[in-house]
Amino acid sequence: MSYTLEHIVKQLGGALRGPNREVSRLAPLELAGAGEIAFVASAKFRRQMLESAADALIVTEALAAELPDRSLIVAADPYLYFARLATLFHPPKAPRAGIHPRAVVGVGCRIGESSEIAANATIGDNVVIGERCRLMPGVVVGDGCEIGDDVTLYPNVTIYHDCVIGNRVGVHSGSVIGGDGFGLAWDKDHWFKIPQTGRVVLEDDVEIGANTTVDRGALVDTVIRKGAKIDNLVQIAHNVEIGEHTAIAGCVGIAGSTKIGARCTVGGAAMFVGHIEVADRTHIGGGTLVSKSIKEAGNYASSYPLQSMKDWLSNAVHVRHLDDFAKRVKQLERELETLKKSKEEPHE
């Protein structure tokens, strides 16, 4: 599949500068060649831009002035333009309408005529599935679930009973939506399991990565709000709420009843204790332990930066003696204060 730059601009906007070439592929800036188009995210890639052999480049207005003889698409945000162009070149696969003979569908289900239910998918009783959905092989949907339009459940996704999935949601392979939350009460010498009676609600335009788990609520629902993006291997515990358009990177753990606001970003391997709240537009660095509520938007981090093993071991030794250091500093402060007083006292 190939497109002229003129066609691309008509579809996606932007401004065409230079010759109207035809391109068939997207490629990284430093590797792009004939028939390929690349984007320049910012001026820090100026050298790679000037050396690039790409047939066309997506650039800002400021950078376009440095490339008077090249084929360009000028855009306010080249990275966003690249994302939309990638979708033009690689549109989502349309469902093949129908229910495969080897799929299992329970009683009382309502499934949109344009949706695809693949081989070995299992759908419980009284499930509602909208139009243009794709349920791939090995998907399991429990009783009473509601699934909107244009939803894709990749192979071996499990949706437990009574969960609600909005429109244009994607859940990737191996993820489990609606498993029991970790609710236990201590009874003398053993744990007593607390029934988890809430649901999981994934609102419109949510995407869940591979092997991620979202636990159902104990009494109220666990809710992932509109447009939130969750990466692979993320654990979201019961009663958690993730705000609209928040993005969470891989290997994050969020303990129960925590609420993360809208339009936040969370770096990989960050951990959240339970029963805290995080303000809208908060940005958490990778590896951070969030141990208390964050009431003001901003950038937060608590992980040590990378250093050599030798330096780390040396610093670790000092950390072990921080209490001794603190006592010595206090003693020095007392001695300094005594010395000051002695100098201030009149001498006979």
Swiss-Prot record:
InterPro entries: Hexapep, LpxD, Trimer_LpxA-like_sf, UDP_GlcNAc_AcTrfase_non-rep. Its EC number is 2.3.1.191. The active site is at residue 238. It comes from the Bacteria. One of its GO terms (cellular component) is membrane. GO terms for biological process: lipid A biosynthetic process. Pathway: Bacterial outer membrane biogenesis; LPS lipid A biosynthesis. It catalyses: a UDP-3-O-[(3R)-3-hydroxyacyl]-alpha-D-glucosamine + a (3R)-hydroxyacyl-[ACP] = a UDP-2-N,3-O-bis[(3R)-3-hydroxyacyl]-alpha-D-glucosamine + holo-[ACP] + H(+). The keyword Acyltransferase applies. Disulfide bonds: none annotated. It holds the Pfam family LpxD. One of its GO terms (molecular function) is N-acyltransferase activity. Keywords: Acyltransferase, Lipid A biosynthesis, Lipid biosynthesis, Lipid metabolism, Repeat, Transferase. Homotrimer. Belongs to the transferase hexapeptide repeat family. LpxD subfamily. Catalyzes the N-acylation of UDP-3-O-acylglucosamine using 3-hydroxyacyl-ACP as the acyl donor. Is involved in the biosynthesis of lipid A, a phosphorylated glycolipid that anchors the lipopolysaccharide to the outer membrane of the cell. This is UDP-3-O-acylglucosamine N-acyltransferase. The gene is lpxD.
